[in-house]
């Protein structure tokens, strides 16, 4: 077993369809039921903002470059300063890359550019950041040296916030 299955988070007897007729929410647990580490970031993003970005496309194509039309269920984030073309998909763009353990990871452009903008101004409405700046911030290195990274310096439980 390499990670959580569908029923770890979703209730198999509730609908996950996004409409007004769906019964229940489809979720039976939240991230904080298993994870207790808080993030060192502003108060806006929640866990799924970064760890479940809209990096997946179904039959609908969205013109926004860093956003698919459905949320991915690849929770791991590749913290290297590489974008989707070099760090998430194969050269043809037809498959998600896997590491030696068979795990995939979303790249920082998907995880961060839904809120931040790249150097061309593409992305969300917040500050412009390069992939290197995003990587340095997440890891707590470079201009962010000594900060400990986005997860590590905050040791208190989320319930204590």
What positions do the PLM features span?
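Inter-heme linker and motif-flanking segments adjacent to c-type heme-binding CXXCH motifs
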Residues: 1-157
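Short, solvent-exposed mixed-charge patches
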Residues: 159-161
């Amino acid at each position: 077993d390499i990670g959580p299955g569908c029923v770890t988070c979703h209730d198999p007897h509730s609908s996950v369809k996004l409409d007004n007729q769906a019964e229940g929410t489809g979720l039976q647990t939240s991230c904080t039921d298993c994870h207790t580490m808080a993030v060192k970031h502003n108060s806006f993003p929640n866990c799924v903002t970064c760890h479940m970005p809209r990096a997946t496309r179904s039959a609908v194509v969205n013109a926004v470059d860093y956003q698919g039309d459905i949320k991915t269920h690849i929770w791991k984030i590749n913290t290297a300063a590489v974008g989707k073309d070099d760090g998430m998909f194969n050269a043809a763009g037809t498959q998600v890359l896997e590491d030696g353990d068979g795990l995939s990871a979303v790249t920082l452009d998907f995880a961060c550019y839904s809120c931040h903008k790249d150097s061309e101004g593409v992305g969300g409405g917040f500050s412009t950041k390069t992939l290197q700046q995003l990587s340095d911030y997440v890891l707590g290195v470079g201009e962010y040296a000594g900060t400990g990274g986005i997860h590590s310096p905050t040791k208190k439980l989320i319930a204590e916030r």
